[in-house]
Amino acid sequence: GADDTATHELALWQVHEIAAGSTLSLGKVAAGARSYLLIAGGIDCPQYLGSRATFTLGQFGGHAGRALRSGDTLPLADLAECHLPALTRLPEALIPQGAGAVNEAQGKNDQGKTTGREWQIGVLYGPHGAPDFFTEDDISTFFGHRWEVHYNSSRTGVRLIGPRPQWARADGGEAGLHPSNIHDNAYAFGTIDFTGDMPVILGPDGPSLGGFVCPATVVRAERWKLGQLAAGDRIRFVALTLEEARAIEVQQDAVIAALASGQLDTLEQRQAETSGATLSAIAAKRPRPDDSPVLKCLSAEQGGEQIVYRRAGDDFLLIEFGQMELDIALRFRAHAWMLWLKEHPLPGLMEMTPGIRSLQLHYDPRSLTLETLMAHLEQAEVALKDVEDIEIEARTVHLPLSWDDPACQQAIDKYQRSVRPDAPWCPSNLEFIRRINGLADEAAVRETVLNARYLVMGLGDVYLGAPVATPLDPRQRLVTTKYNPARTWTAENSVGIGGAYLCVYGMEGPGGYQFVGRTLQMWNRYRRTEHFTTPWLLRVFDQLRFHPVSHEALEQIRRDHPQGRYDLKIEKTRFRLADYQAQITEHQAETDAFRERRQAAFQQEIDDWHARGQFTFEDQINEVQEADSLSDDELGIETPVTGSLWKLEVAEGDDVEAGQVVALVESMKMEVEIRTHTAGRVVRLPIKEGSGVAPGQPLIVLSTAVEATDSADASAPDNARSTLSSEETL
């Protein structure tokens, strides 16, 4: 028969039956940031660590661990097991407008620049607040300000633009130079993490462990909004109580249950109860939190060490032990609590994640209330006052280290060129480490790192089994600050120091530790070998020793290690806390002298930063250049999104065709192609590469009065252009 080229527009929020051989085309997202396509039965892809979700940074899960590409084939699951929903179309009145934003329409600010949608997002205050980490004014500003979503956002985290905190502390002590730095603890889902002076809402692909303060956490019922925040949108955080957060979730659960069962009357009633007016009313009543994130505090006499319980959203509890200092005994106390909770299980307690001096508990508030959990923990307070006799099995793992590896130098160079040209740790992280620790030369830095025995205090800092470790001997603890702002790129398995801690990056991604070199893989995605009996290589309380190798030798080791062809030296040992404490006491005078010298150099660095105006950093990346006015015969090629002008594909004087790609804009970790819709000649390029851009802003100015020299050739018939058959698109 004849070709059927008919095109049918399909409504959203509706179940459709698609005929075999059809092609489904998806257009632009009109509201929010993401659109979702659900297929009956789902896509048949293998599970990885119990999930089919794609983790592109880790390169596993989903389809080949990456974003889809043209030509990929996706097998569908067995439709025999699929049950269609009772409702095949969502009633018009129940369809969220503007993806749930308070104000869905884009408008203009006082300067006439395009602004995005405005959102209200419900959060719980904590785990970190005033007066410990922030000032009271900081907290008022945080909840009173309308934060703007930065274009450099993704599933890892939503970066925000807004006022810089004044901070309650001068610095982070041994955790780092900046007052946002703390000793690493686990992060709750949806927590708002201040990486230096810049807040980031941690998303589903965000880190599980890190060393930055978090003043608020998005509650469970509000986390869906994180997936629809687009660059340029504005957010106001609404301070909820735990009871309000729970009530919103109960209502939301009822809406979903009514939707699944097709009970329209119940659904409309529940939808009305969960309208945005609820958050607006709460915000008007409570412009900032009127409670504390600290739920309970025990003295050292009551708990063996000071114990602080901090609220971290409506399904996490952060327990901190002792003072805010690096003390290995506190890590063992957290370990003892975790063992006790394993021996005394509590229904609804889903996960435990230890930090340097903390233990975070993830619980299901539907089945376990916070009050019940806190009552259960009172038994641990009594049972675990003394942990000095604890003894554990451990290993010494000998790792190769390519000192000042070219991959580290590349990351530093990229950071200096694209993020912060005047950073005090550039162009050499090693020189910065030397200077801030008062060492004679870089050789002394190398000697200290290679002679130290590093105790692994936690895994997953930041991802994929990455260890956070510290020298057992306090006289070998080098202290640095972390990058502010963080790097956008770090090579896999780079080794760095941040605060008093060493980290091996488990995968390529952002980072903030000061580089010393690079080592072998910490994670093996698919292959099991003698040393990779699990995907992760290391265990908590392993002791790491580094030995130097050349860059070329490391490259060969990195090829052999995942295949099981590298002879990694691992020795079994034991660690008894009481014996270690005795050794520390024996060398206390030397340790105190070392700390005094280090602190003097540390303070000198701070003073120098203040003198040079480098203690704080103001992000200029998002500043938008003003657009030139256009004459009658000129046409501006505009950007549809907020972002950064990544690359210009044309130069002044070039003739362009209709549909030609003329620029690339980076937004939300994606490259957006900017195409012309008409032919013309480029007469001006008003925006420089690397500049911030906003919707409606002309990136390229064309003259429509000038006839493009080859425009006739550009208008070739459709059948002369490249096409894909239906078989090729499957």
Please name every model-derived segment.
Residues 222, 227, 530-531, 646-655, ...:
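Short histidine-centered loop motifs in beta-beta connectors
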Residues 1-624, 726-728:
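Conserved "landmark" site that anchors the functional core of diverse proteins
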Residues 610-637, 642, 667, 701-719, ...:
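Periplasmic scaffold and linker elements that assemble and bridge Gram-negative envelope complexes
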Residues 620-661, 673, 679:
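Acidic, low-complexity mobile loops and tails
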Residues 24, 74-75, 232, 654-675, ...:
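Short hydrophobic beta/alpha edge segments that flank linear recognition/processing sites
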Residues 242, 363, 368, 658, ...:
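Long, charge-rich, low-complexity alpha-helical segments
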Residues 183, 349, 645, 682-684:
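A broad structural signal for short, well-ordered beta-strand segments within beta-sheet-rich domains
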